[in-house]
Amino acid sequence: MISPIGGLSQALHSPSDSIFVASLPRDIQVAEIAPQTKVLRSRLWDRLKFEVEYGRRRGTTSNSYLIQADHTALIDPPGESFCDLYLAELPKYLDLAQLDYIVASHVNPNRMVTLEQLLRRATKAKLICSRPAAKVLKATFPHWEERFQTVRSQDMLDLGRGHKLQLMTLPTPRWPDGLCAYDAGSQILFSDKLFGTHVCGDAIFDEDWRQLGGDRRFYFDCLHAPQTRQVETALDQFDPLTLKMIAPGHGPLVRFSLSRLYSDYRQWCQQQPSQTLKVALIYASAYGNTATMARAIAQGLVKAGVAVETINCEIAEPNEIVEAIQACDGFIVGSPTLGSHAPVQIQTALGIVLSSATKTKLAGVFGSYGWSGEAIDLIENKLKDGGYRFGFEAIRIQFSPNLDALDVCTTSGANFARQLRTHKRQRIARQATTETQADRTQQAVGRIIGSIGVVTTQTTGRHQGILTSWVSQASFTPPGIMLAIPGEFDAYGLAGQNKAFVLNLLQEGRSVRRHFDHQPLPKDGDNPFSRLEHYSTQNGCLILAEALAYLECLVQSWSNIGDHVLVYATVQAGQVLQPNGITAIRHRKSGGQY
């Protein structure tokens, strides 16, 4: 059953950016997709309005779903631009007085207008949403607070006749209130922003899915590439489900290419971490303007082949920011200005950045403001004083960014990626040695530059790991190293002829070092090796898989020198594990620090 359609579109068979759909009136397309289940597709044929950084211009649909069993549920009503059309069409299929539930996969100012009208007309309906969404709704509609029903992940909503909605909270930096639903009766996953496509046409389903490939990838890159970690978490939740269909928030429903698109999402997520360069994009947004700028910058970075991890400071934990900073090659911080200041979350994040990010990482600053923009100046000056280099000039946008402003953001993201590549090539060139004629062991020895490493030993089956930065090459034939360690720790058991150990040289930007200390691991304490991938050498000591290089060593001699023991060891074997990596170096401000 399909309700009247406002006309046929022009061909949509090319994914080219230059192809436009016909400019037809907006309409609502209704069809039954499963027993007791309908889709209402609000169709926009020309330029996409509500995601202004999305410039493909092939129109879109805003998909809403109606399940009519013993109880009735309406999933994801559209935004304000379709409110009147939608509320005129919906009563043809449903008496609003009998509507039991409205499920909101996410909320935003655009959708609030339609939700308000529905709540006024459907007087007994409960609004189902995540906890972050409920906070926004209660602030917007305080007089309806008792009608908002918050859910936790894996909560069930039984509609009768076999329709049981399994609700899954899926927060992302872009949609902190994200919620998906799975109907066990119809085996349909209502996926909201996942698996969608911004294309408008007459096809309800994806019969011509091969022709959607370019649009699907473009949609993923624009909306999800900067948040692949969260997308993979969502996919993990979906894995146990038996699916006949995916019902996204935009574009054709996925039935004919179900396994292919699901597999594509896995592959696209995995492609991001495999990029050689990674940027941490850290922001907070009061009214959505700074978030829009962040998405445009991320789009420029992704197009330039750089992996992006977006961190929404309003929902991120401090340890997430620390890990993102340690793992990235460059970082970009965005902030609104509220009362002449940066939000508290950004001030906290900036403190973490200044204490965690090495000076070799490239930096960027952007933000929106109403009148003065002091927050942007604050962040920029703090980073300048900290000695960081910038990948682009600070971007300042007053009020909401228009298309020209977003183009500046996208271009700045691409420029940042180019600067990052140049910056990294220069660093590699400074470190490079003549390695082509050297064997693997000599290459590994060549990585020693007063570098940070983890010494691993083993005694009677117990493995030990100690962080050190006092190491240098001591001989060429045979290759040997000199290692200084505090004497009060009995040389960590290294003061013994032919004592075996492994020196794991660490890679800059990785977080391995936070698992170790300059003191031996306590006997009954937490064992970091249980959390780190590793394997044993022939001498029984451990190699850390994330190390830049490793050296298998034998102690030849040692001397007590002041408050330290100086150990000389010969290198028996070694290998560079990350040929393109950079050696992590300890920068000290005082010679009295270990």
Swiss-Prot record:
<keyword id="KW-0813">Transport</keyword>
<protein>
    <recommendedName>
        <fullName>Putative diflavin flavoprotein A 4</fullName>
        <ecNumber>1.-.-.-</ecNumber>
    </recommendedName>
</protein>
<comment type="similarity">
    <text>In the C-terminal section; belongs to the flavodoxin reductase family.</text>
</comment>
<dbReference type="GO" id="GO:0010181">
    <property type="term" value="F:FMN binding"/>
</dbReference>
<dbReference type="InterPro" id="IPR008254">
    <property type="entry name" value="Flavodoxin/NO_synth"/>
</dbReference>
<dbReference type="InterPro" id="IPR002563">
    <property type="entry name" value="Flavin_Rdtase-like_dom"/>
</dbReference>
<comment type="similarity">
    <text>In the N-terminal section; belongs to the zinc metallo-hydrolase group 3 family.</text>
</comment>
<dbReference type="InterPro" id="IPR036866">
    <property type="entry name" value="RibonucZ/Hydroxyglut_hydro"/>
</dbReference>
<dbReference type="Pfam" id="PF19583">
    <property type="entry name" value="ODP"/>
</dbReference>
<dbReference type="InterPro" id="IPR001226">
    <property type="entry name" value="Flavodoxin_CS"/>
</dbReference>
<dbReference type="InterPro" id="IPR051285">
    <property type="entry name" value="NADH_oxidoreductase_modular"/>
</dbReference>
<keyword id="KW-0249">Electron transport</keyword>
<feature type="region of interest" description="Flavodoxin-reductase-like">
    <location>
        <begin position="445"/>
        <end position="594"/>
    </location>
</feature>
<comment type="function">
    <text>Mediates electron transfer from NADH to oxygen, reducing it to water. This modular protein has 3 redox cofactors, in other organisms the same activity requires 2 or 3 proteins.</text>
</comment>
<dbReference type="InterPro" id="IPR029039">
    <property type="entry name" value="Flavoprotein-like_sf"/>
</dbReference>
<feature type="region of interest" description="Zinc metallo-hydrolase">
    <location>
        <begin position="57"/>
        <end position="250"/>
    </location>
</feature>
<dbReference type="InterPro" id="IPR045761">
    <property type="entry name" value="ODP_dom"/>
</dbReference>
<dbReference type="InterPro" id="IPR001279">
    <property type="entry name" value="Metallo-B-lactamas"/>
</dbReference>
<feature type="domain" description="Flavodoxin-like">
    <location>
        <begin position="279"/>
        <end position="417"/>
    </location>
</feature>
<dbReference type="GO" id="GO:0016646">
    <property type="term" value="F:oxidoreductase activity, acting on the CH-NH group of donors, NAD or NADP as acceptor"/>
</dbReference>
<dbReference type="InterPro" id="IPR012349">
    <property type="entry name" value="Split_barrel_FMN-bd"/>
</dbReference>
<dbReference type="Pfam" id="PF01613">
    <property type="entry name" value="Flavin_Reduct"/>
</dbReference>
<keyword id="KW-0560">Oxidoreductase</keyword>
<dbReference type="Pfam" id="PF00258">
    <property type="entry name" value="Flavodoxin_1"/>
</dbReference>
<dbReference type="GO" id="GO:0009055">
    <property type="term" value="F:electron transfer activity"/>
</dbReference>
